[in-house]
């Protein structure tokens, strides 16, 4: 029993450390096709919210829409960046920019993770997944899935890292 418990702890300890790490050194692209190193979102020293989503994910679209509706109010109360990372692959990534523009989501930074490198590095298994990084780049909050009202929980977490 003791040996089994020690084995489980030994397996989980490295994952605990990984959960607290910041952003990996990975290149994604912006909607214009320009290379973008994800670590550069931390350059201003403000908290960053990263939302992983894709175009055919209904909860993802609901979440982004709900956040878009309150984003300007949030910006009045807190200093942070919001980055939406599309995990659409090469077959569907061409739909991202028209969707973003059509929905009027102009206040966020939208990035494309076509090869899934960032998604894998951040251990994102399903979408939507929201990750909040504090000013130092430490992951302080993660939420998987979306139901109406989750955006308020996210904002409470954003306020904690101001």
Predicted regions located by residue number:
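A short beta-strand-turn-helix
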Residues: 27-47
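Thiol-/selenol-based redox modules, centered on thioredoxin-like
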Residues: 132-162
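Boundary of Sec targeting at the N-terminus
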Residues: 19-21, 34
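Positively charged n-region of N-terminal signal peptides that target proteins for export
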Residues: 1-4
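Short, internal strand/loop/helix patches
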Residues: 99-133
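Aromatic-flanked redox-active Cys/Sec active sites in thiol-based oxidoreductases
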Residues: 51-57
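N-terminal signal peptide c-region/cleavage motif recognized by signal peptidases
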Residues: 14-16
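Structural microenvironment flanking redox-active thiols in thiol-disulfide oxidoreductases
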Residues: 62-103, 115-120
